[in-house]
Amino acid sequence: MNYSWLYGASFAASTELQTMASGWYENGTEVIFACGGNMFQSVAAAAAANDGAVVGVDVDQSSQSDTVITSAMKGLSASVQWACGKVYDGSFDEIGGTFVTLGAKDNAVGLPTATWSLTKWTVDDYNAMLAKMADGSLVVDNDYSKLDSTDSLTLNLVK
């Protein structure tokens, strides 16, 4: 797997970003995770012009482009309800002013199943994996140094 990463420094759509994304698609990139507000529009336009795919962010962005294969969604409703619950039960002082990470067990992350378009991974597969993440039997660890090997991964930092 080749993984290229670019910090956009802006949430704005631009012809420069669309041109760069088009170049990535032309050089073999299959999917771009367009994480950053309106920059999604530039990446989706490049994907449409190059038979590419896009992963949306924050909400289900499938209605914005036929190129969206899924979206990494924040469970905004669940997280707001969780925080408001802390206010109403009198325990907000436990979380106020602190950094809190919510995840699968809190229904605070997910993929949109109603607009599912992935072909090699089913909604049932996803739901089974999400349930394991929520119950703790599958732990997602961001410490890549624990991997047996990264020989099949190439990381390109684009500046």
Per-region residue spans from a language model:
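A residue-level marker of the well-folded mature domains of exported/periplasmic proteins
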Residues: 1-159
